[in-house]
Amino acid sequence: MNAFDADITEHADSSGCHPLFRDVPATVEFNKLRKRLVRLTRQAIEDFAMVKPGDRWMVCLSGGKDSYGLLALLLDLKWRGLLPVELLAVNLDQGQPNFPKHILPDFLTRYGIEHRIEYQDTYSIVTDKLPETSTYCSLCSRLRRGNLYRIAREEGCSAIVLGHHREDILETFFMNLFHGGRLAAMPPKLLNDEGDLMVFRPLAYAAEDDLEKFANAMQFPIIPCDLCGSQDGLQRNAMKAMLIDIEKRMPGRKDTMIRALTNVRPSHLLDRKLFDFAGLMANGEKGSDDALW
């Protein structure tokens, strides 16, 4: 048992668990999965210094497996006394056709989770401005972001918490590499342009497969992500397929890639803004030529 797992066990509440977890499968497999996800979530929170005791976090809930998992894991940590912040679950209903409006309020109320459901018909704005053949995701996400910032301020929240996981980060990295000509991924911690709100991604280390298994075991009432009829762009789908193929042929590569994003060596890249190549001069001292040849 490592330090994270030991702390999780030690801090378990005497009443057992958050109401969300009272009817979960009593299997070794689920317990291992839950413990792994809790550990990785807590590790990301600690690695990137997300917690300021007494803060109020706005947890964005779309109804997909990732955001449900995020909310459940944060509630689990808070129940154990390992996350000293307030949590507010927020869903932004963007007016997509056939959106089942009752699912999230019913779920959140049933488990006594503080929440806010906000209706803003951004779907009509998107469909009015873009042709039917376009992918709506980019404009839709910009409109959603603006509304989420507004809601966070209205609710006195210090941070917006999103459910992006390991695969989201890697896909974004390769999209930027192949199509943007830059080395960049999704930051686990970000300060917004106005400087008044943080954006956190506590699932940065969590695997999508684990989150899917977790959602199935927890029997979350999943809302499909294709209600608007638009799908993510071809570029992201291609990156997802590439990563699946790499992991299939060389198991464990996704974990290696995530570790690589935490182990950057600017002197071994070509960005003159990150390393002073012009000021690098021989002075008779030994340098490091690892991997240079």
Swiss-Prot record:
GO cellular component: cytoplasm
Keywords linked to the UniProt accession: 4Fe-4S, ATP-binding, Cytoplasm, Iron, Iron-sulfur, Magnesium, Metal-binding, Nucleotide-binding, RNA-binding, Transferase, tRNA processing, tRNA-binding
Cofactor needs: Mg(2+); [4Fe-4S] cluster
Superkingdom, natural source: Bacteria
InterPro entries in alphabetical order: Rossmann-like_a/b/a_fold, TilS/TtcA_N, tRNA_Cyd_32_2_STrfase, tRNA_thiolation_TtcA_Ctu1
SUPFAM superfamilies xref list: Adenine nucleotide alpha hydrolases-like
Keyword set includes Nucleotide-binding: yes
N-terminal signal peptide: none
Catalytic reaction annotation: cytidine(32) in tRNA + S-sulfanyl-L-cysteinyl-[cysteine desulfurase] + AH2 + ATP = 2-thiocytidine(32) in tRNA + L-cysteinyl-[cysteine desulfurase] + A + AMP + diphosphate + H(+)
GO biological process, one term: tRNA thio-modification
One MF term in the entry's GO annotations: tRNA binding
Enzyme class: transferase
Motif (PP-loop motif): 62-67
Enzyme Commission number(s) from the entry: 2.8.1.-
Transmembrane segments: none
Subcellular location as annotated: Cytoplasm
Cofactor note: Binds 1 [4Fe-4S] cluster per subunit. The cluster is chelated by three Cys residues, the fourth Fe has a free coordination site that may bind a sulfur atom transferred from the persulfide of IscS.
Entry-linked HAMAP family: TtcA (MF_01850)
Complexes and interactors: Homodimer.
Similarity section: Belongs to the TtcA family.
Free-text function comment from the UniProt entry: Catalyzes the ATP-dependent 2-thiolation of cytidine in position 32 of tRNA, to form 2-thiocytidine (s(2)C32). The sulfur atoms are provided by the cysteine/cysteine desulfurase (IscS) system.
Additional comment: The thiolation reaction likely consists of two steps: a first activation step by ATP to form an adenylated intermediate of the target base of tRNA, and a second nucleophilic substitution step of the sulfur (S) atom supplied by the hydrosulfide attached to the Fe-S cluster.
Name of the protein in its database record: tRNA-cytidine(32) 2-sulfurtransferase
Source organism: Brucella melitensis biotype 1 (strain ATCC 23456 / CCUG 17765 / NCTC 10094 / 16M)
Gene, per the UniProt record: ttcA
